[in-house]
């Protein structure tokens, strides 16, 4: 109940995405957050199920559902249900789409020795390509997209908890992510900025094993005139754009900052940008590839 006894809107998260991208970990994470969870609810049952939830009188005010292509009537009914829910005041629906690079999904299938549900008699990559094509429109309608490439199950769980815990549900979130171009562009990024033109601490021997979180590396990256000019122009651009993204109803904006390996320059700049906007927006900073180069002692 609200402060005046009014029913609070039901928070509905529909978890979908690529097979092998982490939906099982996701639904378990929502259970840990106190959500009422159902795996593989047919879209035809969604309106009736939500009516029952509504009639419960806020006894189930947080609901997470896994929906995927195991339901053969998936698209015929899901899009219609989403359109109808968008017009209702008593429910706040969000689509969380889990994705990963094809090579990562293939590796996960090989590790578990599973076949792809859409192509059980074909190599996993054939099913992955078909599924990606079928889910393209749904991905375009998702409010939140997670790229689980390189994420361990624990890291995906932590990401979900940061996003969906009760104290975090205060609207628009800016997720500033550093990454290395050598490992691929994050597929969940809304905006991508390339900082490989900046001076590289990798070529300074004592900085090579460190990261952009270390003070001396950060100071080195930020001290250059071209860095300061870039940050000035980028922050000016983002300051202009962010209110419009927020107005469009996005719940999060993923800003990806990339350098060669994702260890030095992109890390320092991602931290700087997140700090700059933290007074006006809820911000989260993450470093996708920061530990990779350290692990191989490049």
Swiss-Prot record:
- What PANTHER family does its record include? RNASE ADAPTER PROTEIN RAPZ
HAMAP family attached to this UniProt entry? RapZ_like (MF_00636)
Its taxonomic path starts at:
Bacteria, Bacillati, Bacillota, Bacilli, Bacillales
Q: Which GO terms describe its molecular function?
A: ATP binding; GTP binding
- Alphabetically ordered keywords of this record: ATP-binding, GTP-binding, Nucleotide-binding
Q: Which residues bind GTP?
A: 68-71
The record lists the organism as Geobacillus kaustophilus (strain HTA426)
Function description: Displays ATPase and GTPase activities.
- A Pfam family found in this protein is PapZ_C
Annotated family? Belongs to the RapZ-like family.
Protein name as annotated:
Nucleotide-binding protein GK3066
Residues the record lists as binding ATP:
17-24
């Amino acid at each position: 109940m609200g402060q005046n006894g009014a029913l609070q809107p039901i928070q509905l998260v529909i978890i979908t995405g690529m097979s092998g991208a982490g939906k099982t970990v996701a639904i378990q994470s929502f259970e840990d957050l106190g959500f009422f969870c159902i795996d593989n609810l047919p879209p035809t049952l969604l309106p009736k199920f939500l009516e029952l939830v509504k009639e419960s009188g806020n006894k189930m005010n947080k609901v997470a559902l896994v929906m995927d292509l195991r339901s053969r009537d998936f698209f015929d009914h899901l899009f219609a249900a989403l359109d109808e829910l968008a017009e209702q005041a008593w429910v706040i629906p969000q689509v969380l789409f889990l994705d990963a690079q094809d090579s990562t999904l293939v590796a996960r299938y090989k590790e578990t020795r599973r076949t792809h549900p859409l192509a059980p008699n074909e190599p996993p990559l054939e099913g992955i390509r078909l599924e990606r094509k079928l889910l393209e429109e749904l991905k375009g309608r998702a409010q939140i997209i997670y790229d689980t490439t390189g994420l361990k199950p624990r890291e995906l769980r932590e990401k979900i908890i940061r996003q969906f815990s009760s104290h975090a549900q205060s609207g628009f979130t800016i997720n500033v992510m550093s990454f290395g171009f050598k490992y691929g562009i994050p597929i969940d990024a809304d905006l991508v900025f390339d900082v490989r033109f900046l001076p590289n601490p990798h070529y300074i021997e004592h900085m090579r094993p460190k990261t952009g979180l270390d003070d001396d590396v950060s100071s080195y990256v930020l001290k250059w005139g071209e860095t300061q000019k870039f940050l000035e122009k980028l922050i000016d651009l983002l300051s202009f754009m962010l209110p419009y993204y927020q107005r469009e109803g996005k719940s999060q904006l993923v800003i990806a900052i990339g350098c060669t390996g994702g260890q030095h320059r992109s890390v320092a700049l991602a931290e700087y940008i997140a700090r700059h906007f933290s007074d006006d927006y809820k911000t989260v900073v993450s470093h996708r590839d920061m530990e990779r180069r350290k692990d191989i002692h490049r």
